[in-house]
Amino acid sequence: NKFLADRELKLICPVCGNETKGDQCDCGHVPTKEELAGSICVECGNKTIVKDNKNLYIALSKLQPQIEEYVSLHKNNWRKNAQNETDKYLKQGLRDRAVTRDLNWGVEIPVEGYENKRMYVWIEAVLGYVTATMKYCEENNLDWRQWWKESDNNKMYMVHGKDNITFHSLIFPGLLLALEDNYKLPDMIVSTEYLNFNDQKFSKSKGIGMTILDAIEELNVDTLRLHLIKNGPERKDTNFTIEDYKATHNEITNKLGNFVNRTLKYKGIETIPEGNMDTTFKDKIEKMYTNISEQVEKLEFREAVLLIIGFLDEANKYYDE
């Protein structure tokens, strides 16, 4: 005898055939109200029935021309999956999205007649970026407007998984545009594919994978950070295994650790002295620095790490020769 939020529903996705919650499938499909009509309650397993309900909506359909203009100006700097997913929804025509839910927890709605509703999490979550900036600036005697009002002095990067693309490329810009208060919109949409664990999707309920807290307790943090970037799912899903992590640890230990150790040990050096660097090798280092910086600016973090590891091979070769 209650209205259920989309996350409290489950159904079979008509696109990929997998079971999904009612808000969005892992394949990216957002169930329509017709598809939700045959859904099941996650809590009790009973089939749901459709009744009229009253919610507040953001009129994305009215904002589509402004959103399209924003996307056209920025999308060339986005990851390819973000470009494709965003273009797909714009081509279909943006649908108005409900911004309220029937829940007893969450951000309250300060609108008469909606006091028992709560804000949809992906509305308050993205607006939380602005709120967090305001809070930080308030505590540090700074002006939050220098980041969130139009400025040529900063760039805004939205980093997330591919299942959250539209919240950052369409809904968040739509919310800011609707405020009509000259807010800065995201410059870069940095959306990754999925990272799997031993060829399976991470799942807390099924006990597949490890939490980040477990990982930093059991593994070397520096190696873990390097491995996750080196093996990052930038263009396709990738797989995490302990064996691959160990291989990265051994690779960087051998190529960097041994190079530094044998160089200092060979000369009995405890501190690095002043000296003259081989001009040719210095030029290689400067070129490498430029190349890596360019890759980072293009959001090609994996390629940047591979350039660093590749240069370690050159450094070891230089030492041997």
What are these regions (language model features)?
Residues 1-57:
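Cys/His-rich short segments
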Residues 4-7, 21, 32-33, 79, ...:
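Alpha-helix initiation/capping motif
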Residues 6, 37, 138-139, 146, ...:
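Polar/charged alpha-helical tracts
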Residues 6-9, 14, 18-23, 184-194, ...:
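Short, charge-rich amphipathic segments
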Residues 15-16, 40-269, 298, 304-308:
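Structured secondary-structure scaffolds
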Residues 236-249, 287-289, 314, 318-321:
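Surface-exposed loop-to-helix/strand elements on domain peripheries
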Residues 259, 263-266, 285-288, 292, ...:
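Amphipathic alpha-helices that form helix-helix packing interfaces
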Residues 271-293, 318-321:
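Acidic, turn-prone loop/beta-hairpin segments
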